[in-house]
Amino acid sequence: MGHVLGGTLLAANRLARPPAVVLGKPRVCCWRASPWPVIVSSALQFSSSSARHTNYTSARYEARGRSTTQRKVDDRPWHRESSGSLPKSTSPDPTGGDATKGRLLTTPTRLLKLILPIPFHPEQEYINSDETKTNKPKEDAVEPLALLVHPQQPLSYLERLIQAEIPPLLVKDREKLPEIIFRAEADYTGGNKSNDGRREESNGNGSNVASYSGLGREGPSKGDTHWVRWSGSTEIGDFIRDAARGREFSVTIEGHAEELRVAVPSFKDRTYYMRMRLRRMSQEIDQMATVKRECDLLAHKGAHALAKGGFAALAAWWGIVYYVTFHTDMGWDLVEPITYLAGLASIMGGYLWFLFISRDLSYKAAMNVTVSRRQNALYQERGFDPAKWDQLVHDANGLRREIKFAATEYGVEWDEMKDLGGEEVKEVLEEEKGGKARKREQEDEDGDGDDDHDHDHDHVSHGAELQGQDILHANEAAANVPGD
């Protein structure tokens, strides 16, 4: 009954609702239960079918626009959104204010950081497109491109990196990757003509000898320079070392009229971080060397004092034996067996001690044991870490070797004393280097001796085995002979 009454009241309420009155654009509906009219927006008058059609059309155009934008973002990095309105950098300008010249910087690692200005507009689709787009204000230009490369990578790898960051070249309605050409200053000029028409060689070493210079960008500017193209298979490090005879090298992009100039790093630039690390290590080595020198001196003094004490004990023993033998009533008959037993006991004790330390029976071995124990005790007392010392010396010698190798390749003289901080640090490094070399040679000699002994033992064992086999075969042959 309740359901029937509820349905009747709902139907009556719907029949009592007045028709809508349209006043202009909005539609006003009057309700009996509410004293105020309700205004419904005209945007809700669309039917569901028209709304679906509109949504489908807008989604189609949005998908078309998004696919084009996404294609530009994926295929061409210079089309990224807001690529021309990036925030201003607070770090110093690595190009030195010259937006048309690149820089090749040295990093704390072995990698090189190439900062190359991109001479194209962010909205430029092709290199050889309308040139009016390239004449935009400077604020719309793409920021310089930074690339990290290893000196042992070829120039072709750097070429691929640059091609991935610049627009393609349009050739016969088809996209083509532009060719990247690397040029450096040549070490020949083809001969300069003098006033009388004869040719003079500009290279004092001869026309068949390449000249090198580690000045790089620090070198003097030359008015008339000759350029040579380098193969893409050349390693970047070799190319830079050869290009260091001039102040810069050029990067030519196919389809772009102007070439990009990059400042060549000098020997000081290439080895800057290595020399800074060597200076820090040299200071730390100098401080640790002072502590180590004091500990070693005290340890050697203690070892010599111990040796002197042993000699004093032997001298005292000799004096006691002399006094008891010649100045007492006991005489030689009683002292003789005591001296024999004491000497034999000393020999047995020394033999057991050398057997315990597993070293050669020598004064040097005994001194090394006593000195090393005293050194370890002093190192622990003074806070000296031998493992850290060995690592520092090894790293410092490694840096010295790398810097010397770079100086040899650049053809310059390296002032080692300036970076090491003095002759004492150099002596410490050379001494540790020579000591490790001698220790390694001694270990190799000991290893060769053990190998020879093992080889002789194996040879004897093999000979005994062959002899045993011969005897066995002889016995078998004798057993097979028929008896008389």
Curated annotation (Swiss-Prot):
Coiled-coil annotated residue ranges, if any: none
Compositional bias segments (type: Basic and acidic residues): 61-82, 426-435, 452-462
GO CC terms, sorted: mitochondrial inner membrane; uniplex complex
InterPro entries: MCU_C (IPR006769), MCU_fam (IPR039055)
Effect of residue 354 to A: Strongly reduced calcium channel activity
Recorded consequence of changing residue 347 to A: Strongly reduced calcium channel activity
Feature: compositional bias, Polar residues: 83-93
Activity control note: Inhibited by ruthenium red or its derivative Ru360.
Locus of motif Selectivity filter: 332-340
Topology of this chain in the membrane: Multi-pass membrane protein
Residues binding Ca(2+), per UniProt: 336
One Pfam assignment: MCU
Family to which this protein belongs: Belongs to the MCU (TC 1.A.77) family.
Protein name: Calcium uniporter protein, mitochondrial
